[in-house]
Regions:
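Alpha-helical transmembrane segments and their immediate juxtamembrane cytosolic regions
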Residues: 1-336
């Protein structure tokens, strides 16, 4: 790894993080505001099906996979700078765990504590052969996905992220667009087949009475096929980012992803504060939750873009970095 590679930020990962965050909030807002189940055959019921088919478990999977990629890049770059990447990573996930402990008091379904714990589990795999990480991650994911529990899929997804980092897949996207196109096409076919199968098991009504078993089966199928759909989403985004016009149009998404920690935690703050002030708890419908998320998108995308014009790090990213390296990096950008 040369000096340029050590200091160069991989933009595509920021785009993907921002993309994942935009999907995650659509799901997280439901339990946070106790959104009521919709009446069958309404627009709210249709939106709920849309969430379970195209969002639930898809963007969380992307975010988890990207944690594995970031894990490999972080340690590699730290080692290349002559620092102890393992020690720095342990500090990094300890700080992440602390953030998670605070966050879980307000959002019981939060992911940071899980990521920190699983970060310890994947640490020995940093030096494993990339083929081993790829094969082991795929086999684990295939087997554990049959249990339809998102928690079981975290470690294998992170291992696949490590393998992607070892293969340097995100550092040469313009050179690999043909391979990416074939991969994305294959994932599209599998995704369509899986989604059709899941849709065929969609319940008439969700979550009550005799329909609860059907609902659970519908959800289990969705979680099982989630990694396939997520792989298609990632491949499609990478293909689109090969076009400069797309990169320009989606540039706010890159800023959003660069401040992923700040935006992830502030999503919860915005939802809970607005829920309290506007009395939304148990009074908001599924479609209204979508409109609320759209408003949060505008706020956070705008804030992220403006903030990063003047500062090098997001607010919580700066705290995270400071506590990881035990030094205070300059926050404000230097003007030339």
């Amino acid at each position: 790894m040369n000096a340029k590679e050590i200091s160069t930020r991989i933009d595509v990962l920021d785009y993907l993080r921002g993309y994942a965050l935009m999907g995650i909030i659509l799901v997280n807002i439901i339990p946070l505001l106790s959104v009521k189940l919709p009446i069958p055959s309404t627009s709210d019921a249709s939106y709920l099906r849309f969430l379970y088919l195209f969002v639930e478990g898809r963007f969380y999977t992307i975010f988890t996979f990207l944690f594995g990629v970031g894990f490999y890049i972080f340690i590699s770059r730290a080692n290349a700078k002559g620092k102890n990447g393992y020690v720095l990573f342990l500090r990094r996930i300890l700080v992440l765990f602390i953030f998670g402990l605070v966050h879980v008091q307000f959002h019981p379904g939060e992911a940071l504590t899980v990521y920190a714990i699983c970060g310890l589990i994947i640490l020995p795999f940093y030096k494993a052969n990339k083929v081993v990480n790829l094969v082991f991650g795929m086999v684990m994911l295939l087997v554990l996905s049959l249990y339809a529990q998102k928690m079981f899929m975290v470690v294998p997804l992170m291992l696949l992220g490590i393998a992607a980092g070892q293969y340097r897949l995100f550092e040469r996207i313009s050179d690999q667009w043909k391979v990416t196109a074939v991969f994305t096409g294959g994932m599209f076919v599998l995704s369509v087949a899986g989604l059709i199968y899941q849709y065929q098991h969609a319940p008439f009504a969700f979550g009550s009475g005799g329909e609860s078993i059907e609902t659970q089966q519908f959800l289990r199928i969705g979680i099982t096929i989630g990694p396939i759909v997520s792989a298609f989403y990632i491949g499609l985004m990478i293909l689109l980012l090969n076009f400069p016009v797309v990169r320009q149009v989606l540039s706010p998404l890159k800023s959003y992803g660069r401040m992923a920690l700040t935006n992830y935690l502030s999503q919860t703050i915005l939802i809970l504060v607005a829920g309290k002030v506007l009395d939304l708890f148990d009074h908001i419908t599924y479609l209204q939750s979508l409109y609320f998320c759209l408003a949060i998108y505008v706020i956070q995308l705008t804030f992220s873009a403006i903030w990063l014009r003047h500062f090098s790090f997001g607010p919580l990213e700066w705290v995270w970095r400071t506590m990881t390296y035990f030094e205070f990096p300059p926050m404000r950008k230097t003007r030339v």
